[in-house]
Regions:
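Outer-membrane beta-barrel proteins
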Residues: 2-181
């Protein structure tokens, strides 16, 4: 619990320094008998230069029916290269997953492509995530596609669909709001 409090405090402190903050709501539907959940996420991002961005975030999961809680705290680094309206990116991240019965570290790698036309940006990516210790059974592959619309230069809304396979099987519908500073 102390680690969760420290991570949350670090995230809130980071809000004062972030170039953008994203709030996201997720409706996760379990596949093949897996439980549904309602999730909320907050992420703070800061550009290091034109190619590199760092982020820190936390996601809270609430399982339908049981109301069991789990949390993922994660930090990542994204490299991106724009080529006209098309961009390619690769994100690497590490984090901790907390539940009422376990706590373990994990890593993820996500390559993808973006395409921007005016205020609309489409994104397609593939994420591989696994626990540092294979015994924790957290190996997943996520195929994702999303679109965002820049309402103003500082405000954007987005929608994303994720399909997760592996040790977890689900799909989710995700709505987000991003405020840039």
């Amino acid at each position: 619990m102390k680690k969760l409090a420290i991570a949350t405090l670090a995230l809130v402190t980071g809000l004062a320094f972030g170039a953008s903050v994203t709030l996201e709501g997720q409706n996760q539907i379990g596949d093949h008998g897996a439980a549904d959940s309602t999730n909320s996420q907050i992420t703070v991002r800061e550009s290091l230069n034109k190619m590199l961005t760092v982020d820190v975030g936390t996601t809270q999961y609430t399982t339908a029916g049981t109301h069991a809680l789990s949390t993922r705290d994660e930090a990542g680094l994204t490299a991106s290269v724009p080529v006209g309206p098309v961009g390619v990116y690769a994100r690497v991240a590490a984090g901790d997953k907390f539940t009422n019965t376990t706590h373990f570290g994990y890593y993820s790698v996500e390559p993808g492509v973006t395409y921007t036309v005016g205020a609309v940006t489409a994104k397609v990516g593939f994420r591989f995530r696994d626990a540092f210790n294979e015994a924790n059974l957290d190996a997943t592959r996520t195929t994702r596609a999303g679109v965002s619309y820049a309402i103003t230069k500082k405000d954007a809304v987005g929608f994303r669909f994720d399909r997760v396979t592996g040790d977890s099987t689900n799909h989710s519908l995700n709505l987000s709001y991003t405020r840039s500073f």
